[in-house]
Structure formats: structure tokens, C-alpha cells
Amino acid sequence: MTRTISVIGSFKQHNREIQRTCEIFRNIGLHVNSPESAEIVEEGIDFVRFHTDPQACSDAAIQSLALHRILRSDLVYAVLPYGYIGRTTCYEVGRILQSKRPIYFSERPGDFPVHIPDAFIVDVARLSALLEQDDWCPEWLFSGVNNEEGILETRLINGDFVDD
């Protein structure tokens, strides 16, 4: 079965890098669920739309459709040149973590108040090599993490809220 991946990041700021990353993943045989297209409808607007997005849908509906594609992927890769993450990508990362889906990052996100273990910061070449190994299995960011941040994040997701 073909592995699936979604690539997220600031399409407004870094679409070229994101599309190059998508092409690398396609070249090793992965199916890229999201983004579905490389063609941006209008440059410079706050919420980027692609030509494959239904024109009649609101921005919120487009985002929800994208999240459906993202969350049904085997893993997600966040392309963050210079650590830039952006508002929409922050939102997506939060939903991905809450859904216990595997996510990896090209660079450590700046201005992002979640602990990212070093093992989840991997460049595209290293992640591609891992994905070509049949026995490699992507993990959720907090799987097996027993430090304070990992325990607190796991408790949040499980609805076991701390009374500080």
C-alpha cells in the first residue's frame, strides 16, 4: 500500500519550498494528500487558495477540507524555512497533535510554545530515506515521552486535565 503524506507550512510565504518538498516525496512513491495543487489562485492574500479548491466554499470550509486530507495521511511534514510557522500552520499543528497523528518538522518552529523533541526535526532528505524503509513507522510526537511536557500534553489529549 502506498504511504500518504501531507505537507504543511506557509503557502503564502514559502509555497515554492513546499512544492519542491512535495515533488521529492512524489518521486519516492508517496501520495501527497495535501496540498492537492501547486497553483495559487491569487498571490499575496492572507488565506491561500489553490485552483483545486472549490470556489463556492468559504475559507473556513476550505481549511476543514484540507484538515480532512491532512489527518487521513500516514504522516505530516511541516516545511518551516527559518523556523517560520504562521498562524494557519500553528492551528493545523495543534489539530494534528490533538488527533495523535505523526508530524515531523523541517526546522524547529519559532514562536511555538510546544516542546518538539529533536527526533522530529528532520530535513527532507533524511525523512525521505526513513520513508523508503519498509519497516520504519512514523510516530506521534509524544509517543513514549516521559518528560513533563510530554506527560502534560498526553493528559490534555486524554481529557485528564491537571488542577494546578
PLM features: what roles do these ranges have?
Residues 1-164:
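Conserved catalytic or regulatory cores that recognize and/or transform ribose-phosphate-containing ligands
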